[in-house]
């Protein structure tokens, strides 16, 4: 580094040394002393001519002593210069060693830092690649699950449509059954009227028989003429006895049929009891399912709380929330199906009870008819006995009896015709009762089939609920795993950030150490420069002393040349020292610029910090979006629960009001117009109730649509369009206006025509 300076110093020392051991001048001799000594020597040489030899010898001795002193001083200065050169060489060697060791350390630290940086970059790249692969796999799995859930949702929609169709068919069957019941009631009323007419005719004929008895009492005088008629009457008596036997046989047959009907009634009661037991079982099962549903709702609430506490900012939570809403909709559909099954079973039981009551009434009416026929037969027997007594007592009334035979025969024929008509009516009643029993049996079979279908559907829904629970548990596990993975990723990011901070701190420390070492090097270089300056000054003094000695030994003429040479040397050493200083500074600056450690912190700090800030901002934005979506979905869930409560209340009111009104209308109008009036009244009540329900729901939806925010109103567009029968263009216009209100710089949508009620589209009743 200082090769040029070393060469110059060696040349100067070689010039300064004389061949044959030149004497040294002491360091303290200055230019003034040299000048004074030259002046003295000149004076002395000038005075040599005039002085004596003794003075010359004394002066020479003095000069020799002075020369010896100067040589001793020069030798001391030479030793000091040698020592200084040795110290300088040692310092240069130590400085070179220190520079080499520091450069090696810097290179090693730079290599280790670059290796660590490369390892960290590779690790970060591998970790990011792994995370990307994991997220892509998870996204694929979530998309597959989404497709599966959409297929399940489509199947559930199809099932719900099938259930609605079945419910409509059940409603139609109930309407037909009500019409048939009204017809049967009308027929029974007609038969009761005919039976009343027959009773009136029987009463009139009993009156006629009493009149005939009075006539027979009056005709006792004519018993002699009626002896022949008595024989005929006896024959007629035998025929009447045969008829009585026939009537008794028919009575026994009717009693047997009555017992059979009672047995069937008992069987029906047993079936009703079984149905009630099944109903109790179904209610118990529904209560258990409602408990399960409430438990699931509590789980859903707890999961929502956990999600709100976790505040995880990932997109798969949105899909989990969608699946949660789908599961809640499925639960609500199962509740509606259970309510429909309950209502249908309750209606079926009510219809069965009413039919059993009607059959009991028909049985009571048939028993009353049998009692009346028994009374008629007993009255006929009493009449026959009275006739026999009258025949025995009044044999002389035979002629009058012959006259009355024809009348009696006519009356008996009329009675026989009446009995035949009664038997026919009884047979018709029996056939109608049997038909009613068959219809009831068929309806019971249909109800059993419906019950089996509902049980199957309930089992299917239970199985689906189990599947949904399992899927929900799996989703919970997946969400927990995702949360753990996110926490691990966050921990890794924090660790990477800490490592980056530690590395930056290490780099700062190394920079500080470099600065300190550079400062130490600069101080040492300054000391070296000071030593070189001292050495140069010493060399200058030595050269001056040598010049003085040469001037003393030579003539005064040579002193001027020596002085000029010394001045030239001084002039040359100034730029040489400046060049050495500039070379040192340029070398130090080149080392500092070539050292890659100074450029590392700028290249190594910024990307990590920028990536962390971007990730934090994105996570915060995603967290805010997820929180808003959770709040909106919670609000929609609460709105759906309120709607379900309102619909339950309206359905309960409808179920409470409808049967009482129907019974009241049936009792008030028992004429021939019942067959046409009853179904029309029920249809009108159904329509009015449905309209009231639709109006209340429409009012609720419109008020909610007008009072809520734009983001919530955007979800209610479909309901408003369905209730108000909007067309697709009107619905799109509503969406565009809401989007214009929600946006900041959107353009206002152009009106596509006046909104008119869609008459062509039929109104779809809300269900």
UniProtKB/Swiss-Prot annotation:
Result after altering residue 743 to A: No effect on subcellular localization at the Golgi apparatus, small decrease in RAB6A-binding
Positions carrying Phosphoserine: 30, 36, 41, 47, 50-51
Effect of substituting residue 9 to A: Decreased TBC1D23-binding
UniProt keyword annotation of Phosphoprotein present: yes
Domain named GRIP: residues: 688-737
Matching Gene3D superfamilies: GRIP domain
Effect recorded for residue 698 to A: No effect on RAB6A-binding, nor on targeting to the Golgi apparatus
Result for mutant: residue 4 to A: No effect on TBC1D23-binding
Modification(s) after translation: MARylated by PARP12; MARylation is required for basolateral export of E-Cadherin.
Gene Ontology CC entries for this record: acrosomal vesicle; cytosol; Golgi apparatus; Golgi membrane; perinuclear region of cytoplasm; trans-Golgi network
Major location (coarse): Golgi
Effect of residue 5 to A: Loss of TBC1D23-binding
Result after altering residue 744 to A: Drastically reduced targeting to the Golgi apparatus, small decrease in RAB6A-binding
Keywords: ADP-ribosylation, Coiled coil, Cytoplasmic vesicle, Golgi apparatus, Membrane, Phosphoprotein
Stretches the record annotates as Disordered: 13-58, 748-767
Keyword set includes Secreted: no
Localization per Swiss-Prot or TrEMBL: Golgi apparatus membrane; Golgi apparatus, trans-Golgi network membrane; Cytoplasmic vesicle, Secretory vesicle, Acrosome
Coiled coil: 50-657
Outcome after substituting residue 697 to A: Loss of RAB6A-binding and of targeting to the Golgi apparatus
Membrane topology qualifier: Peripheral membrane protein
Subunit structure: Interacts with RAB6A. Directly interacts with TBC1D23. Interacts with FAM91A1; this interaction may be mediated by TBC1D23. Interacts with ARL1; this interaction recruits Golgin-97/GOLGA1 onto the Golgi apparatus.
Free-text function comment from the UniProt entry: Involved in vesicular trafficking at the Golgi apparatus level. Involved in endosome-to-Golgi trafficking. Mechanistically, captures transport vesicles arriving from endosomes via the protein TBC1D23. Recognized vesicles are then tethered to the trans-Golgi before subsequent SNARE engagement and vesicle fusion. Selectively regulates E-cadherin transport from the trans-Golgi network in tubulovesicular carriers.
Further details from the record: Antibodies against GOLGA1 are present in sera from patients with Sjoegren syndrome. Sera from patients with Sjoegren syndrome often contain antibodies that react with normal components of the Golgi complex.
Protein name: Golgin subfamily A member 1
Gene source species: Homo sapiens (Human)
Lineage of the species this protein comes from: Eukaryota, Metazoa, Chordata, Craniata, Vertebrata
């Amino acid at each position: 580094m200082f090769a040029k300076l070393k060469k110059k110093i060696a040349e100067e020392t070689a010039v300064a040394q004389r061949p044959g051991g030149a004497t040294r001048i002491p360091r303290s001799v200055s230019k003034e002393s040299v000048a004074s000594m030259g002046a003295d020597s000149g004076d002395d040489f000038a005075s040599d001519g005039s002085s004596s030899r003794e003075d010359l010898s004394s002066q020479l001795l003095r000069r020799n002593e002075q020369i010896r002193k100067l040589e001793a001083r020069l030798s001391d200065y030479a030793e000091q210069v040698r020592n200084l050169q040795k110290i300088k060489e040692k310092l240069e060697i130590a400085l070179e060693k220190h520079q080499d060791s520091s450069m090696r350390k810097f290179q090693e630290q730079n290599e280790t830092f670059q290796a660590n940086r490369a390892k960290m970059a590779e690790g970060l790249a591998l970790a990011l690649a792994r995370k990307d692969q994991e997220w892509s796999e998870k996204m694929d799995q979530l998309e597959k699950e989404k497709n599966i859930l959409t297929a399940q949702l489509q199947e559930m929609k199809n099932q719900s449509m099938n259930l609605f169709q079945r419910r409509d068919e059940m409603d139609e069957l109930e309407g037909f059954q009500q019409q048939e019941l009204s017809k049967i009631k009308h027929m029974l009323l007609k038969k009761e009227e005919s039976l009343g007419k027959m009773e009136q005719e029987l009463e009139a004929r009993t009156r006629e028989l009493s009149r005939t008895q009075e006539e027979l009492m009056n005709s006792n005088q004519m018993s002699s003429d009626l002896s022949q008629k008595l024989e005929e009457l006896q024959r007629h008596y035998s025929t009447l006895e045969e008829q009585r036997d026939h009537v008794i046989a028919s009575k026994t047959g009717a009693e047997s049929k009555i017992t059979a009907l009672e047995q069937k009634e008992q069987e029906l009661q047993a079936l009703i009891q079984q149905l009630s037991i099944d109903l109790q079982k179904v209610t118990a099962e529904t209560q258990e399912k409602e408990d399960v549903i409430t438990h699931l709702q509590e789980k859903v609430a707890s999961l929502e709380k956990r999600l709100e506490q976790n505040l995880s900012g990932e997109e798969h939570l949105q899909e989990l929330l969608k699946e949660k809403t789908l599961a809640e909709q499925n639960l609500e559909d199962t509740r509606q199906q259970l309510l429909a099954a309950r209502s249908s079973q309750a209606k079926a039981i009510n219809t069965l009870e009413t039919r059993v009551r009607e059959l009991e009434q028909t049985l009571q009416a048939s028993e009353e008819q049998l009692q009346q026929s028994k009374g008629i037969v007993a009255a006929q027997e009493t009449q026959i006995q009275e006739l026999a007594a009258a025949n025995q007592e009044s044999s002389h009334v035979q002629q009058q009896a012959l006259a009355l035979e024809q009348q009696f025969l006519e009356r008996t024929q009329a009675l026989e015709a009446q009995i035949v008509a009664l038997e026919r009516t009884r047979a018709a009643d029996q056939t109608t009762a049997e038909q009613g029993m068959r219809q009831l049996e068929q309806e019971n079979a249909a109800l059993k089939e419906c019950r089996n279908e509902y049980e199957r559907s309930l089992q299917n829904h239970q199985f689906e609920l189990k599947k949904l629970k399992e899927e929900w548990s799996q989703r919970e596990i997946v969400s927990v795993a995702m949360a753990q993975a996110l926490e691990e990723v966050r921990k890794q990011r924090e660790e990477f950030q800490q490592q980056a901070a530690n590395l930056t701190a290490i780099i700062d420390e190394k920079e500080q150490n470099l600065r300190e070492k550079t400062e130490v090097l600069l101080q040492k270089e300054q000391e070296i420069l000071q030593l070189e300056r001292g050495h140069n000054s010493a060399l200058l003094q030595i050269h001056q002393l040598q010049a003085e000695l040469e001037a003393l030994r030579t003539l005064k003429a040579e002193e001027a040349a020596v002085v000029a040479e010394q001045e030239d040397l001084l002039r040359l050493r100034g730029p040489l020292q400046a060049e050495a200083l500039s070379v040192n500074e340029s070398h130090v600056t080149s080392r500092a610029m070539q050292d890659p450690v100074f450029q590392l912190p700028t290249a190594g700090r910024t990307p990590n910090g920028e990536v962390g800030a971007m990730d934090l901002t994105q996570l915060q934005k995603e967290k805010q979006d997820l929180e808003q979506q959770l709040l909106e979905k919670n609000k929609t869930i609460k709105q759906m629960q309120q709607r379900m409560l309102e619909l339950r209340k309206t359905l309960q009111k409808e179920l409470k009001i409808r049967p009482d009104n129907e019974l009241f209308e049936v009792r008030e109008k028992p004429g021939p117009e019942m067959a046409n009036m009853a179904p029309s009244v029920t249809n009108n009540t159904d329509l009015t109730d449905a309209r009231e329900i639709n109006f209340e729901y429409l009012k609720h939806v419109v008020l909610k649509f007008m009072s809520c925010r734009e983001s919530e109103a955007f979800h209610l567009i479909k309901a408003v369009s369905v209730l108000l029968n909007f067309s697709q263009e009107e619905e799109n216009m509503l969406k565009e206006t809401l989007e214009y209100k929600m946006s900041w710089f959107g353009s206002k949508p152009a009106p596509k025509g006046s909104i008119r009620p869609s008459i062509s589209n039929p109104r779809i009743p809300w269900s």
